[in-house]
A protein has these predicted regions:
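Bacterial Sec-dependent N-terminal signal peptides
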Residues: 1-22
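Structural recognition of the beta-strand scaffold that forms the well-ordered cores
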Residues: 31-34, 74, 103-107, 115-119
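Short clusters of hydrophobic/aromatic residues that line enzyme substrate/ligand-binding pockets
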Residues: 38, 76, 142
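Flexible glycine/proline-enriched surface loops and loop-helix/loop-strand junctions
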Residues: 38-39, 100, 136-138
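A non-catalytic alpha/beta surface segment that caps or lines the substrate-entry region
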Residues: 41-107
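Alpha-helical metal-binding/catalytic segments enriched in His/Glu/Asp
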Residues: 106, 114-119, 124-148
Length: 148
């Protein structure tokens, strides 16, 4: 019984430690990607491009295989809405009056018959506008999450 309790405590302590280590490793990523330096990461902006390069470099460090058409990057274009109820047009080719940006794509091969795809966007609202919590007030950097 004493051995079982000791083993349980050992496993519990190790699992808590690894969770904290993981959180500590994630914190600098979140701090950088949500920093004012990236000016809200508006789609196709310098800040969004810097964020994409940062994610690409993290993927490299984590030995995640590139799967985009251009290494880790997959270019796309879209035409922003001029009216809030208008449909958005997205394409993998250039659209007139469009914004061109990149998705970052990586692959972890677990040698399985099945693959789970997890997607997320790293661009955001930049300084606001349509969809912004602050669209009617002073211009502010939107660091993330108010459009979710």
């Amino acid at each position: 019984m004493r051995l079982a309790v000791t083993l349980f405590l050992f496993i519990f302590i190790i699992s808590c430690s690894s969770e904290n280590t993981y959180k500590n490793k994630m914190k600098p990523d979140v701090e950088y990607l949500s920093s004012d330096q990236l000016e809200g990461r508006s789609t196709g902006s310098k800040g969004a491009n810097l964020a994409g390069k940062y994610i690409k470099n993290r993927f490299k460090e984590l030995n995640i295989k590139p799967m985009g058409e251009d290494g880790y990057f997959q270019k796309f274009s879209f035409k922003p809405k001029s009216h809030p109820h208008e449909k958005i047009t997205v394409s993998d080719s250039i659209i007139e009056n469009s914004i061109t940006a990149n998705n970052v794509i990586g692959f972890i091969n677990n040698n399985s018959d099945n693959t789970i795809v997890i997607g997320a966007h790293y661009d955001h609202l930049g300084y606001g506008g349509e969809g912004s919590l602050y669209r009617d007030s002073d211009i502010k950097i939107h660091n993330g999450a108010d459009d979710n």
